[in-house]
């Protein structure tokens, strides 16, 4: 019995020695040990580079007005943010930030303060362009004209909420192409869950590279049931903002073409009467009296097939197309009415002025 026990112990020792030689990792195995690492070697996830690229170009904007109850002293009425677009000193902000201002003050992040000149503003997009005359260089926002914002892109909202000083909030692009959020229904917004608070209006919405994606413009204050929703903010896409800026710099206002209809797009359908051609277009549901469309003979329930030789697929895109046509131009508009195709000549007018 004792001999068998010794034999078993000896075999166990031999097997153990073989395993230690074959698998050296077993020698230091300690099930109670905690993995050690040096945190100084790790790089934390950060958007600091994007902030350093974009933030210097985002300014504080102060709307000052005369207070007749205080011996006509200038006082701050509203505050917001703005974005320096180029070295000439042009700044984009929201129109509602500078409405009725007697004086506009712009404060840069480097401590410089300027009185700004209002170049022009546009009610339909709620955009305004300011200009400052600065000696020395100005920080400008990075713009990549080829960059297309996508749902899920990380974005940073930069502005001056509640006059706390420059603040950065982070989120994603929640949706693109949001329309119908302003009275004109013509606006095309980016939606984001990055916080956009009072004072952020006119500030920059940038991507993770610090490139301008949009101009922060508004957030939902109340929902239909009276609750204050969180994570719903909007920005004007940078492509539209830069286009409006160029027009304001050139003309001092935005000159838009106007056709004078309201409508909705329809999906392709087969023409009545067994025709094989598929129709797609905009059904006219409103014609402004004495407007260009009415004067050309366009009627309610007409189906617009093309405008100025371009297919009419989206009501918003077609209105944007018309807006780019200079007033006074005569364009062909093809409509279907009672199974007949008509080509009508429409003289474009200037879009009626709004406050």
From Swiss-Prot:
Substrate binds at residues 184, 259-264, 351. It is a single-pass membrane protein. This is Serine endoprotease DegS. GO terms for molecular function: identical protein binding; peptidase activity; serine-type endopeptidase activity; serine-type peptidase activity. Allosterically activated by the C-terminus of exposed OMP peptides (consensus Tyr-X-Phe-COOH); cleavage only occurs in the presence of peptides. Inhibited when RseB is bound to RseA. Coiled coil: none annotated. It is found in: Cell inner membrane. It comes from Escherichia coli (strain K12).
